Amino acid sequence: MFNEIIKTVEWGGKTLELSTGKIARQADGAVTVKMGNSVLLCTAVTAAKAKEGIGFFPLTINYREMAYAAGKIPGGFFKREGKASDREVLVSRLIDRPIRPLFHPAFVNETFVTCTVLSYDPETPVDILAIIGASAALSLSPAPYLEIVAASKVGLINGEFFLHPTLDLLKTSQLDLVVAGTNDSVMMVESEAHLLSEEQMLAAVKFGFDSFQPVVNIIKELAAEAKKSKLEMQDLYPAELKNEIKKLFAKEIEQTFAIKSKQERSTNLELIPEKVLKHFADDIESKKYNNYQIESALKSVESDILRGNILQKNKRIDGRTTTDIRQITCEVGLLPCAHGSALFTRGETQSLVSSTFGTSLDEQIIDSLEGEYKERFMLNYIFPPYSVNEAMPMKAPGRREVGHGKLAWRAVNPVLPTKTQFPYSIRVVAETTESNGSSSMATVCGSSLALMYAGVPIKAPVAGIAMGLVKEDEKFAVLSDILGDEDYFGDMDFKVAGTSEGITALQMDIKIRGVNFEIMKIALEQARLGRLHILEQMNKVISKPNNEMSKNAPSTTTLKVDKDKIRDIIGPGGKVIKEICETSGAKIDISDDGTVSIYASDKDKLKVALDKVKAIAIEPEIGEVFNGTVMKILDSGAFVNYLGNKDGFVHISEIAEERIESVGSVLKQGDIVKVKLIGFDNKGKAKLTIKNAEKDKSSANPKPKNSPKEHQEPEKRDNGKKRAWNEDNNAETTEVVTERKYFS
């Protein structure tokens, strides 16, 4: 019944299996991918006819993780998979980026690729399997997919690269790198690194590239045995059409590209297609050419002019050389009520960034196939339409915003302090207020500035830069700090972020084949020099974290208690912890290991809650002195409450040095007294004394000998009074805003 084709290869110590002909046989291309206990179904379907009047290739990639793949039932009311998670969006983009450039340029048929995780093994990288499966499915479909792509994931521990790092290994790995490409070219790189050098990053890319070559070969074998036919494609446009457009409009295009202002240049460029279409109106009517052919030929002419200026004249749109960085302006502390804020401007790209601290209760809860976990650091990238002067409504975050935000997250995350060092959750919001190339790298720079201003003890400032490439045959030029048009017409978008000591994130998308490792080496070195220049400008404003935090930031402290005391702090049905929170106004979070985190809007509320927790969790020692309250008077003595929830008995003989006739003659209910713990009776009840305690009253409520060390938070600043707007603290140089002296 089934005509199944199966191909296997030993890869990185595991067996990779690709099969077709059994599942989803009606799809144009369908491949089942297996490695370990992971199983994915990848399908590709192409529309029979081209989509008219569209100026781009309508490729849609959908990666889905089914809950049953990990033996789970989805959460939520409906108990079924819904909107794509951020993880699914990111993997969808990861699949799209190396595949999209490899279709025939004239192909505009709608194409849908779906990769579904059917069985999930945490020991295998399902995102890599999805890229491989998508490539294999497309190779079996009629779509003119010109090259076969494969991918690999690389880790680094103790100076050794290795394939297929598991989630546990990634916790200690210095590198999490995905590289995808063909037999002869790298097409895509995505990575997070812990301050690695350019040489190490290039070596990692080479290691990953070499490792997936056997996978490319078995996909080719699978496609060859399946013998699926491909759509025959014609040239995107006739050569004579391009020549005529070049002859008539090249001069005007050249003059337009000489305009340095993006807005003015874009406005003038938008007028040219109207003129071109008007010129060819008769040819369109006679169906000699269609609109798409004319617009494509025009884009090719524009590309030739821009690229020719760079390669032949060393002349970029805005007059810079290939290594020049646009003018940089940095400001911090713009938003008085934010915990930290910064405005980073590079040329016509600008990012307004704020940082906010929260409690551990504010951490993002993520439900994944691996299980539920919390994310302490959140970075939200926002790209509003006004940033590029588009008259459009604001929408929910799209795939691009999720992807750019994650790239900036990867760049900043390696320099953040541990939770022990800084027990806050952190949210960074970066709104792109202007955009003309590399807004994600502006987000990285602005985030670093905002975090340092807020007082987050990051290990080092972080900056990012986007590199470009123009290549014709053997001649090429690597561009630093690319503009939007240089990205659009160029051959590579290469983003590198890091500190002065090394790289923290790298993302590379290549649109052409033939970019070798020598070009990558040059690009990495040029990016390093550009990154150091940007860091130098940022350091003129703020070079290290402030010692003071905003007065609006929550006060916090943490302490470690015995695990046996957790139930006492919580109380039956949460009664005790709820009472502490209500009476103190604080928030309390308790971890399973006995770490108690307390947060409050001010230090007074924090102290009230801390004292109550200590009273429950910390056992007093004999000889310690406490403040107590007389609760009940008896003939033989008095009951005194101390440490909030503990009671002890003071015998009449322990009330005063001299003999007294009655307890009531010295003490009254409600009196505040000093008491010393002198022992316990045979029932474990505390025995207290007042007469000896008065001599040691200076040591009342001492810190117990075994009391845990508490986190000491930085001092807080007054955001309003010390950050008032005036001309002095906004004086600018030609490059950067001078450092603001907000703190005494």
Curated annotation (Swiss-Prot):
Biased composition range(s): Basic and acidic residues: 707-718
One GO-annotated biological process of the protein: mRNA catabolic process
S1 motif domain: residues covered: 623-691
Keyword terms of this UniProt record: Cytoplasm, Magnesium, Metal-binding, Nucleotidyltransferase, RNA-binding, Transferase
Keyword Cytoplasm assigned: yes
Primary location class: cytoplasm
Positions that bind Mg(2+): D487, D493
Cofactor entry: Mg(2+)
UniProt entry tagged with the keyword Transmembrane helix: no
Gene3D superfamilies per UniProt: GHMP Kinase, N-terminal domain (3.30.230.70), K Homology domain, type 1 (3.30.1370.10), Nucleic acid-binding proteins (2.40.50.140)
Record's GO cellular component terms: cytosol
Compositionally biased spans, kind Polar residues: 727-736
InterPro entries in alphabetical order: ExoRNase_PH_dom1, ExoRNase_PH_dom2, ExoRNase_PH_dom2_sf, KH_dom, KH_dom_type_1, KH_dom_type_1_sf, NA-bd_OB-fold, PNPase
Locations listed in the record: Cytoplasm
CDD domains with a match to the protein in the record: KH-I_PNPase, RNase_PH_PNPase_1, RNase_PH_PNPase_2, S1_PNPase
EC class name: transferase
Catalyzed reactions per annotation: RNA(n+1) + phosphate = RNA(n) + a ribonucleoside 5'-diphosphate
Entry GO MF terms: 3'-5'-RNA exonuclease activity; magnesium ion binding; polyribonucleotide nucleotidyltransferase activity; RNA binding
Residue span(s) of domain KH: 554-613
Record family assignment: Belongs to the polyribonucleotide nucleotidyltransferase family.
Known function: Involved in mRNA degradation. Catalyzes the phosphorolysis of single-stranded polyribonucleotides processively in the 3'- to 5'-direction.
Protein name: Polyribonucleotide nucleotidyltransferase
Taxonomic lineage of the native organism: Bacteria, Pseudomonadati, Pseudomonadota, Alphaproteobacteria, Rickettsiales
Originating gene: pnp
